[in-house]
Amino acid sequence: MPEMPQPTCQPAQQLHGFVVRDVTPLPADLAVAYLLEHQASGATVLHLHAEDKENCFSINFPTPPPDDTGLPHIMEHAVLAGSEKYPVKEPFFEMIKLSMATFINAMTGWDCTYYPVCSNVPADLWNLADVYFDAVFHPLLDRTTFSREAYHYAPADPADPTGELVISGIVYSEMKGVFSDPEQRLSRVLSRALFPDSPYGLESGGDPVAIPDLTYEQFREFHRTYYHPANAHFFFYGDIPTAEYLAFLDERLAGYSRNGGPIEIATQPRWSRPKDIVEGYPIEPEEDAAEKTYLVLQWLTGDSTDPLDALLMYVLSLVLLGNEGAPLRRALVESHLGADLLHSGDMHVGRENTFRVGLKGSEEDRLEPFC
C-alpha cells in the first residue's frame, strides 16, 4: 500500500536556482506539497510528491481576457502549432500519436490557461515536458498560424473559389457553435451582467462577433505580456523527485529576469441592490416560442480560493439542491413554473463563487412567482 513520502526539502532551502517557500505534509492525500520560487525569473512551482507512478507536468498562466476577441483561447491553440526547437506544424498531435502519455491537453479557463501532460514513464514525461516548455515560451506564432487559428476569409462554397467569401477559422468556428446553444449563450449573458467591472464579464473563449477585431500585433503582445516565467505557475504530481523537476526548469529558465511579476486579477465590486436583465435569443422562424423562456437568479457569494467559503457553498448547494428530496429542488419542481431545473447550484467563476437557480421551459409571466 502506498505511503506518504518523507519530506526531502526544508523551508528556505535553496536548490537548483529555487528557494523553498513552504513544505506541507498532506496525510489524507499521502503526499507532501512543496511550494518553491525560482529566484531569477520569479516562476513558482507547486509539487505534490506522492508514491504514484502517474506523473503530471503542467504549465499554467493567469490570462485574464482584455476583451471579447478570445485572445487566451486563440493563444492556447497557437502556441501548440510549432516552436523554435520543434518547428513542426502540429506538435500537439504528433505527441498524441508518438508518446505514451496518459493525459495530454491544453485548456482555457475564465482567467487562466493550462498546459498539462501526464505519463507513467519518466523518460516519456521529460520528452513531453520539453516540447510543452518550448511551445509556451518559444512559439513561432507566425501570421499563418494566427489566421488559421483566429480568423480568415474563405469561399463560402469550397467548390467555387471565386465566389462569396465568409469568415472562417478554428477558434471562430468553434465559438460560433458554442454561441448557437441557447444555454451556453445564457451563461455568457449572466457572466457579463454579473461581472461588468471584472475580466470574468469578458469572453475568454472569444465572441464570434468580436474575434475578427483582433490584430496580429495584439496577438503577439498578449504572448509577451502573459507568457513569461514571472507569470508562470508550474504544477507537478507523482513520484519523480522534486529536485529533478527543479533541475529541468532551472536549465530552461536561464537568462530570464522577473519582468514585473504575476498578473493580479481584480474581483467584481459588490452592488448595493439586485439588477434585472432581459435578453433575447434567436429561434428558427417556424419554431414555436411557447415555453422557450429561461428564468435564472444568480448571486455572487464569496471567494472560491478561500477553502471555508468554497466548502460552505458546496454544502449549501447539496442541502438545497443535491437530491430529489432537497427542499429548493422539490419546491421548484412542484411549482410547475418550468419544465426542468437549469444549471443550478454552486458555481466557480475564476476567483469568484456564485450560486445559481434556474428553470428552463418557462414563460416570462412566471418570473414573479419564480423569484
Residue map of PLM features:
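N- or domain-start disorder-to-order transition segments that initiate the globular core
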Residues: 2-52
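Charge-rich, well-structured scaffold segments of protease-associated domains
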Residues: 2-16, 64, 78, 82-273, ...
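Short acidic-hydrophobic surface loop/beta-edge motif
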Residues: 32-39, 275-285
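Short, surface-exposed beta-strand/loop micro-motifs that present aromatic residues
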Residues: 45-48, 221-224, 277-286
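Short, conserved catalytic-motif segment at the N-terminal edge
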Residues: 53-57
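Short pre-active-site segment immediately N-terminal to the catalytic Zn-binding motif
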Residues: 60-70
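Active-site His/Glu-centered metal-binding helix of metallohydrolases
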Residues: 71, 75-79
